[in-house]
Amino acid sequence: MAKMQAKVQQDERDDGLREKMISVNRVTKVVKGGRILGFAALTVVGDGDGRIGMGKGKAKEVPVAVQKAMDEARRKMVKVSLKNGTLQHEVVGKHGAAKVLMMPAKEGTGVIAGGPMRAIFEVMGVTNVVTKSHGSTNPYNMVRATLDGLQKMSTPSEIAAKRGKSVEDILG
């Protein structure tokens, strides 16, 4: 079963959301009469201001699979709070054997991330970040690990509320 790793494609629709296709795999189902070929697509959608969604779709043809994945990504969007185009703090995300470390970076650093993580940060609107991935490099697992880490991130006001202090006390 051949695996097709598609180049990351970007598209912007009339709704203002940024779309990127991360991968397209050729999949087969073996039945009594032979093999049934299909395609599985993995995509991310973001608004450039901290909202991000991931979707996967399967179909007999590539365009249909990609469209299904884009629709699912639009439905499953989550909000991540950013700070001046970077992350709030260092965070680690895990999914299966994939582990990703994401660190905020100062202005001018750029997006230092590989493969699927780069696509996520570009559609999300992050302009300065440093990342490192450990373990599995499977695109699906890396995307899920990245989203796990981003959802773990908390703002200074959330931390202050948990501790019962003011934001100024937290930021020092």
Curated annotation (Swiss-Prot):
Pfam families: Ribosomal_S5 (PF00333), Ribosomal_S5_C (PF03719). SUPFAM superfamilies: dsRNA-binding domain-like (SSF54768), Ribosomal protein S5 domain 2-like (SSF54211). Keywords: Ribonucleoprotein, Ribosomal protein, RNA-binding, rRNA-binding. InterPro entries: Ribosomal_Su5_D2-typ_SF, Ribosomal_uS5, Ribosomal_uS5_bac-type, Ribosomal_uS5_C, Ribosomal_uS5_N, Ribosomal_uS5_N_CS, Ribsml_uS5_D2-typ_fold_subgr. It comes from the Bacteria. The keyword RNA-binding applies. GO terms for cellular component: small ribosomal subunit. Disulfide bonds: none annotated. Residues 17-80 form the S5 DRBM domain. The keyword RNA-binding applies. GO terms for molecular function: rRNA binding; structural constituent of ribosome. One of its GO terms (biological process) is translation. The N-terminal domain interacts with the head of the 30S subunit; the C-terminal domain interacts with the body and contacts protein S4. The interaction surface between S4 and S5 is involved in control of translational fidelity. Part of the 30S ribosomal subunit. Contacts proteins S4 and S8. With S4 and S12 plays an important role in translational accuracy. Belongs to the universal ribosomal protein uS5 family. This is Small ribosomal subunit protein uS5.
